[in-house]
């Protein structure tokens, strides 16, 4: 996926009210960006970080600029726009860049499923194969090259794991897919120190047949793509 038009660079002043961030451009202008991330953004929003933003041509938007990437002061590149996790995963599936998810003839998005009537991110189908249900999570929390999810307690994420276990019990294929959008991460684990219940459910889900995949994206101000499988430790 390529950014078109190219992203623009600025320096972060502050993130506030969850959805807003003030930045200063190289020519000294101060702008307010829309921040499309409701998470804690730990390590992704330190004042002084370089940010890369896109600009919408929609004149009705109150905040036409969107925060897309952070380049931390340690040099790591992080995608902070959580919408890209699903878009990049879909692109990688269609391009058959994810070997574990190759060979299906149909991809559907936002399909209702399960007793709790969740919406699965993707469902893959093919003749003579069980349906494959895929839930995507964006990973940006890093500590010493270790990637973690979640970055805050997530009851919604816990619900998704319960639903996936039900799917696997019915004989369908169930996959939790962690899209790693942080250039410094080399391995993945659930964030037991943040949400112990989620970590417990993830281990239980694996035991009950839910597949766990983690793929890392190549990230730059020019474009992004999921490329590399990472080891997962529960």
UniProtKB/Swiss-Prot annotation:
Keyword presence, DNA-binding: yes
DNA-binding region per Swiss-Prot/TrEMBL record: 201-220
Domain of life from the UniProt record: Bacteria
DNA-binding recorded as keyword: yes
Pfam family, one: SfsA
InterPro entries xref list: SfsA (IPR005224), SfsA_C (IPR040452), SfsA_N (IPR041465)
CDD domains given in the database record: SfsA-like_bacterial
GO molecular function: DNA binding
Swiss-Prot/TrEMBL keywords: DNA-binding
UniProt family annotation: Belongs to the SfsA family.
Record-linked HAMAP family: SfsA
Biological function: Binds to DNA non-specifically. Could be a regulatory factor involved in maltose metabolism.
Protein name per its UniProtKB record: Sugar fermentation stimulation protein A
Organism: Escherichia coli O1:K1 / APEC
Gene: sfsA
């Amino acid at each position: 996926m390529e950014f078109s038009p190219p992203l623009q660079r600025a320096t972060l002043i502050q993130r506030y009210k969850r959805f807003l961030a003030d930045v200063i451009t190289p020519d000294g202008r101060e702008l307010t960006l829309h921040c499309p991330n409701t998470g804690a953004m730990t390590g992704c929003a330190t004042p002084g970080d370089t940010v890369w933003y896109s600009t919408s041509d929609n004149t009705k938007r109150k905040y036409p600029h969107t925060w897309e990437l952070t380049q931390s002061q340690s040099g790591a590149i992080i995608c902070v726009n959580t919408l890209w996790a699903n878009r990049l995963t879909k692109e990688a599936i269609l391009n058959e860049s994810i070997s574990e998810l190759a060979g299906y003839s149909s991809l559907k998005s936002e399909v209702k499923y399960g007793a709790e009537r969740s919406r699965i991110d993707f469902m893959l189908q093919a003749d003579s194969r069980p349906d494959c249900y895929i839930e995507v999570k964006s990973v940006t929390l890093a500590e010493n090259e270790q990637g973690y999810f979640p970055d805050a307690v997530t009851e919604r994420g816990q619900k998704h794991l319960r639903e996936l276990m039900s799917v696997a019990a019915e004989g369908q294929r169930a996959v939790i897919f962690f899209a790693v959008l942080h250039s410094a991460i080399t391995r993945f684990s659930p964030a037991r120190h943040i949400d112990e219940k989620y970590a417990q459910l993830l281990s239980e889900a694996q035991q009950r047949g839910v597949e766990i995949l983690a793929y890392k994206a190549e990230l730059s101000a020019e474009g992004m793509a999921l490329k590399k499988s990472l080891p997962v430790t529960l």
